[in-house]
A protein has these predicted regions:
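Domain-level recognition of nuclease-like catalytic cores that cleave nucleotide substrates
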Residues: 86-117
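Short acidic/glycine-enriched loop/turn segments that link adjacent beta-strands
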Residues: 34-36
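Conserved catalytic cores of phosphodiester-cleaving nucleases, focusing on short active-site segments
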Residues: 38-61, 76
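Mg2+/Mn2+-dependent nuclease catalytic core
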Residues: 57-81, 85
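Acidic-basic catalytic patches of nuclease active cores, encompassing PD-(D/E)XK
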Residues: 1-30
Length: 117
């Protein structure tokens, strides 16, 4: 597997570790349906978050969060609604984006993480 192909799973694992440190319990990772995919579904006492993880080597071209366009948001919403129809929850649903900047070779160091709630 190419190093580039390993970055996505590495970024999602880094985002999950970040959420755990913030007190979230990971409910699902890479939740896939015919409607789309949600990278991480996590919960704390108040919220059930549907989290899109965006990993980039730098923000030179654009901020990672800018790649969550309206089409992607629609797919996330539809997938989250399907999840909620199959998993009853009293928690308030919320959509978050976790932006990770990881220059080449960063897998051995701490990435820069920004969490947009």
């Amino acid at each position: 597997m190419r190093a580039r192909d390993l970055l996505g799973p590495w970024g999602e694992a880094a985002a999950a570790a970040y959420l755990r440190k913030k007190g979230f319990r990971i409910e699902a990772m890479n939740y896939r349906t015919r409607l789309g995919e949600i990278d991480i579904i996590a919960a704390d006492r108040r919220y059930l978050i549907f989290c899109e993880v965006k990993l980039r080597k730098s923000a030179d071209f654009a901020a990672a969060r800018e790649f969550v366009d309206s089409r992607k948001q629609q797919r996330l919403r539809a997938t989250a609604l399907l999840y909620l129809s199959q998993h009853e929850s009293e928690l308030q649903p919320r959509f978050d984006v976790i932006e990770i900047y990881a220059p080449a070779g960063t897998q051995t160091r701490r990435p820069q993480i920004t969490h947009m709630e």
